Amino acid sequence: MAKGSKGLRASSKAVDPTLDALFASSAGPVQAPAKSKYSTLLDQKVREPAKPKVHLEEDDEVLSEISEELSFEEDGPSDEDEDEDEDEENSEQEDGSGDEQEEEESEDVDETMKDAPVELDDIIDATEDKSNKERKRKRKNDNDDLEGKYLDKVAAEEEADRAGKRQKNDALTKTEKPAVDEEDAGNESDIPVHETLVKDSKASDLDKAARTVFLANVSTEAISSKSAKKTLMAHLSSVLEKDATPPQTIESLRFRSVAFAGGSLPKRAAYITKSLMDSTTKSANAYVVYSTTAAARTAATKLNGTQVLDRHLRVDSVAHPSPTDHRRCVFVGNLGFVDDETVLNTNAEGDTTEKKKNKTPSDIEEGLWRTFSTQGKVENVRVVRDSKTRVGKGFAYVQFYDANDVEAALLLDGKKFPPMLPRKLRVTRAKDPRKTALAQERARGKHISTNGPKSTKYKHKATPEEQSMAGRTSKLLGRSAAVQQRHKKRPSAHGESREAEGQPAGIKGPEQFVFEGRRASARDGLPKDLKQKKGKGKKSGRPQNHGTKRASEWKKKKN
């Protein structure tokens, strides 16, 4: 053993003393780092603080592009990561085998020095790749399902809007039917409906007209005062039956023919501001719509001539108005144009003076009601006014229920009844409108041509012979005669027709009369038994014909 040990150990003389001093102070051969030292570095991950999530409100196209890029990045590194994991496992296995070899083979110093740096570089590369992978995965987590989050946010906002609309429409949905979508409504309108089920607008208008009542001489206080309007409504509903089925009520009340003060102001604005012109007239017209036709008929019969707000009401049905009978009417003229006839005079200096014709303003319509009611029961009073300004035209018509009351009303002619009727009345019988129309046509006929359609001059009536010849003249007398008879033109000697001369075609002049019989002569006055001596008349010459002319010419040539 001692000999063997001596043989293996180098002699002290063979070792260089300088090298011995160098290696004596060194730490020894380079050893591979332990596995546990780098495994701790791999396990420790650098955790960056999480970035705040930002809700990007971008278009759907931008979001889809981002999602495609993210998916592309996820697909790319995944294969590389798998390869890196395999490399790490292989490197770990190699490290384990390397440690065992280092313990067993400590003598191979050069090989370990070559292998150690290679293994260290692989481990460093693996840690860098893993850190990059973790960063990519963090980016992926931050932008994960970005488009879905955006759509969820939009859906939440729409749901909030719908909830707000539902809260607003809760009150309406309780009383009304649920709203129908536009598409459903359009589909329903396209569905054909039988003509018997379709509501006719004309029929509805006729039904409403049957339930409407016309009111005249309504006080304008009902327009300007709410209490006066309530009084009028109570009076109009006083004749309705409370226990009727269906119930009888007043649906609407509309005022018409109102004299407004503002000339340039629209009628609706003037009605809202209650700017009325009482100086023109204190009355207006109105229309009342009842719920049933029976209620309208009852109101028209019972309320006519009644008093409300110190005025007599004229009530008439719109669908079936009362007839106008001239035998029961009187014409009243010389009435005032406006109720308040105050005259304003302005001097040259600009001073304005008022001159009132009457201390108390007149009231024409109500005055006629009260004045003629003393002579009989008045059915209606119609004062003719201008449709726009409501200024009267100075006359009116008063109709009674009984025609005998007209005689008593005629006694009021030439009388005045202040303060409502301050002027003297001109009362006459009302004329038949048909006779008046005929008289107007006659007056117009004077200015119309003789053969005009409304001419009042004599027109020839065709005789039976002419009637029998009608239609056969062209066959019997020729086409020209038929044309003359059709146009009733008889040419005169001068070539002008009788119509052009101003005489009707059916009347003949004195020169056109022809009496049948022989022509009159001087012998008509002599007695028949008287014989007169016949004197020799002049001898008639030879006939002058073609033969005599030739003979005379031949004789002249011969001589």
Curated annotation (Swiss-Prot):
Residues 211-320, 328-432 form the RRM domain. The lineage of its organism: Eukaryota, Fungi, Dikarya, Ascomycota, Pezizomycotina. GO terms for biological process: maturation of LSU-rRNA from tricistronic rRNA transcript (SSU-rRNA, 5.8S rRNA, LSU-rRNA). InterPro entries: Nucleotide-bd_a/b_plait_sf, RBD_domain_sf, RRM_dom. This is Nucleolar protein 12. It is found in: Nucleus, Nucleolus. One of its GO terms (molecular function) is rRNA binding. Gene3D superfamilies: 3.30.70.330. The gene is NOP12. Belongs to the RRM RBM34 family. PROSITE patterns: RRM.
